Amino acid sequence: MSMTTPIVDFVRSYAKSGTARLHMPGHKGQSLLGFEPLDITEICGADELYAPEGIIAESEANATRLFGTAHSYYSTEGSSQCIRAMLFLALQGAPQNGRRPVLLAARNAHKALLYAAALLDFDIRWLWPSAQAEGALCSCPVTAEALTGALHALAQQGNTPFGVYVTSPDYLGGVQELPALAAVCRAQGVPLLVDNAHGAYLRFLPQNCHPIAQGAAMCCDSAHKTLPVVTGGAYLHLGHNAPVQDEAAVRGALALFGSTSPSYLILQSLDACNAVLAGDYPRRLVQCCAALEGLRRSLNKAAAARQCPVPLAVAGAQQEPMKLTLDAAALGCTGTALADALRRAQLECEYADPRYVVLMFTPENPPQDFERLQAALEQLLAAVPAGLPRPENRAGEFAALQQQAVQCCTIRQAVLGAQVRIPVHKALGRVCAMPTVSCPPAIPVAVSGEEITPAAIVLMQRYGIEELSVLR
């Protein structure tokens, strides 16, 4: 597919023109780190991100065709900006019933959701993992049956949520059954909103697993997480079933939560990525996925030969193909200890917690990255002692968190209220102010406005959270 790169072309032409830069930014194109000649602002011809009529509009139209959406909008401030705009738009499109607006959301949401709730002043009803689910802070599989039940329960209270919000893929690589969830939402007249920050590449797999293709009304993609894009580059995608389609309204929502000085370096990166995606990227993506699947099988075969208590590489139909999630229990250690061992072998992971290590690959990783990782893990496997016990099932910890959860005030009241930081072990009975997170994955254990319970303290201590903010 032939693809233009109008933003890249304009900026390069300007950089070569010798024009006196009597405008921002202050470096005037003089190289300090090397990128400065390409770093500009909204000069004549450069267009304007939140009211585009020229090169940005053309580039976004290219992205829209590539992703197959009703419209794909650029963000230079990551999925966090897109999440806030998406929720604002869902609120704007919802019928007004005189009640406080409520969102139905899976509990493993990024803290950006809570910040949006504080800014927009809506309530959240949580979808929790089943009591039998293996406990993990990052995971919250939602079934169509569970969603139907939650919607029915809200309806019995005379309430309809303005949206259903799920994270897919999650930080451990788990994916939701989006077609089934979308069907439930469609039947109930509620938009499905997806945090797809980790899944921009899904559109370019042969089977097209992108949320918009699977029925989501809106989703955010962090292009920078899985595509060759500079940090901060993201998309807000609208499906044809989005509750708001007016372009000015969408751009207004993005502008509400964005800087008036968007980075043209990031915009060029998003623009250049269009050409990559229109080229041989899908073929390279298939090759990368195949290499990772081969690595998973090889590692799990070796783990089975060593009689490890669990497979080393997490696998299954509900796992995205581009994350390699390692279960450190296979080696008899914690995820953080495994990450340290890999770091000594010059392998830096994306995320580690007491149980898991997450490694993110893309087609930009050279073959030697795969080879170095396999060699390091095979060396660790060779040292595994016989008779390791199976890891303890932690599902009870999360069931207790759900059972004990009590919302004492609104999220907005908690986030904006007077607060103080105290040690976790002294927080029992206090009300959580700012979300208590470790980052990554930036998923709260205790939610703003909730009482700090014994179960919350157990989980915070397990995930290394030593202090938290509570209301005074």
Where are the model-predicted features located?
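Conserved N-terminal alpha-helix of the aminotransferase class I/II PLP-enzyme fold
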Residues: E36-Q81
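General small-molecule cofactor/ligand-binding pocket signal
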Residues: Y73, R125-L127, E350
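Conserved PLP-enzyme active-site core in the AAT-like
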Residues: M3-R12, G78-L312
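Short active-site oxyanion
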Residues: A70-S72, R99-L103, V445
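Terminal helix/beta-alpha structural elements that buttress the NAD(P)+-binding lobe
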Residues: E467
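Conserved C-terminal alpha-helix-loop-beta "cap" of PLP-dependent enzymes
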Residues: N300, A304-P454, L459-Y463
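N-terminal "arm"/small-domain region of PLP-dependent enzymes with the aminotransferase-like
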Residues: M1-G54, V190
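Short, glycine-/Ser/Thr-/acidic-enriched flexible segments
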Residues: G29, Y171, H224-T226, N241-P243, ...
